[in-house]
Amino acid sequence: MDAFGCGFSSRRQHRRDTGSCCRDLQLVLAVDVSYSIGLDELQLQRTGYVEAFRRPEIMRAIGTGRLGRIAVTYVEWGGKAVQVLPWTLIEDRQSAAQFAEALRRQPIRRISFTSISNVLAFARRLVHLSPYRGSRRVIDISGDGPNNAGVPAPVARNSTVTQGIVIDGLAIMLRDTPDSASIPDLDAYYRQCVVGGEGAFVMKVSEASQFSAAILAKLTAEISGLKVSGARQPRPEPAEYAQSYNCFIGEEMQERSIGR
């Protein structure tokens, strides 16, 4: 029995179970839809997740687990968060394809502001209220700017990690020149201020053409519990914390923009 109440009986036995029985992974996909991301990028981001769950690499990653099944929910966020797809059991190609199709049919949303702390709190609640239990619990958060609303990101990060939940990040860095809502070292911000927990990592997208490959590599790593390897794959960078890094840069930028 692990820390989350998940025993390790056979895969066959678990496939006969229903309800709140255990899964290898509870995965919250938390996707930034703030107005600082262009509509084209939003569509590329959505398409990247849809295509990923149709790929055989995802099923192979799921198959590496002891139980061969995971639970996934899809959230979109800005200043607030919205659960777009409910907790869904994925254990075979059919269930993965159904999840992908359900996501494809959802409208693209836009939400003002960028509150990493709010979405982390929202995702924590989803994990605890889920009908499923995972031997691993991961929040996969993507975004294109630092936290500028709610409590500071490190506070939310620490609250999440102390509950045994890992936070991984995808830093979206498509701008040639930063604007009032972005910073040039967003990947460093995510490593220092957002992600955390055992094996936590950050990946970055600096060109729109990288979305699909980065999303697939990130999901494969999270589902299998392994780091991404291979020269052709985007490489994750582990979390690292330095007291000298300014984790309040987003809040300071927001204050300057409104003239405080």
State each model region's role:
Residues 65-102, 179-192:
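Short beta-strand-loop
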Residues 4-28, 34-41, 133, 161:
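Acidic, polar low-complexity linker/tail segments
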Residues 21-86, 98-142, 169-185, 214:
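Von Willebrand factor
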Residues 146-192:
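VWA/integrin I-like adhesion module and closely mimicked acidic/polar interface patches used
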Residues 47-58, 108, 124-132, 147, ...:
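Sec-exported extracytoplasmic/periplasmic mature domains
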Residues 30-40, 72, 86-88, 102-113, ...:
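Second-shell loop/turn segments in exported
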Residues 172-229:
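Von Willebrand factor A/integrin I-like adhesion domains
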